[in-house]
């Protein structure tokens, strides 16, 4: 978790199957746990970002930048938006958000990118929760404000199901929110749905097999109180149910869906940051440990292009740390599909 002091501290301180010649035992191949590679780093080091894919390009928005003289007045909160093109391995700076935000929710539908909630600066605090919704149009490289979310909160998670954006959980700096509020871009209107059974913040969410999943997180902003709980929501019945727990209790995580499976990356806890990469199969309700991240991080974002998951930015150590990392995970089967 980033605190004002941790942000300002720099200022204040001045498969291989081996064939044996003869054997009476069969040799089992190593399970395919996916592979990692490194892509072009982002132009700036950041943490507590959000990321999403739109029209084959990846957008990284908001968060905290490394403190410097240029961002002292806004306590290092950034409104910047950076676009990454995997086909060229290059970054481009796009139109900034109307206001600097961190710990936002993000989703893409109808050809636009939506940034929902989060925290912003108010006086000397960087933890003022907001209910704002901003829509980005890549055709005009511009932002527009949309109908505000009913519940102001940050450290929430957003996922998309059938063209609607589900804003789940979060923290208003007093208590965890159980709010599940659904935004319909066509109507520019919000609807409240059944509350999250386990209120939490710094969670991840994803949509798979027609269900919405709320994964991990923490209690009242305290990463020493990480959760492994995962709950699934059925939009048809408007009911929540318990699913198999995340193997590693963690928060400050990110999740992405590829090939019907949900991959959960990173996070932080009292002992440091996590390299864990765990995959959930909604058909079997089971988890599998995948190849760990090259660099453990929290406050990171993820986005998928052509079956590959880009895991972006975030802090390598708990609290106020920053990175420009762009590490790319290819899940099992995707390498064969895309490259072979």
Short names for language-model regions:
Residues 9-19:
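Bacterial N-terminal signal peptides
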Residues 22-340:
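Kelch-like beta-propeller repeat domains
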Residues 3, 14, 22-24:
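Residue-level detector of alpha-helical transmembrane segments in integral membrane proteins
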Residues 1-11:
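Bacterial N-terminal signal peptides that target proteins for export
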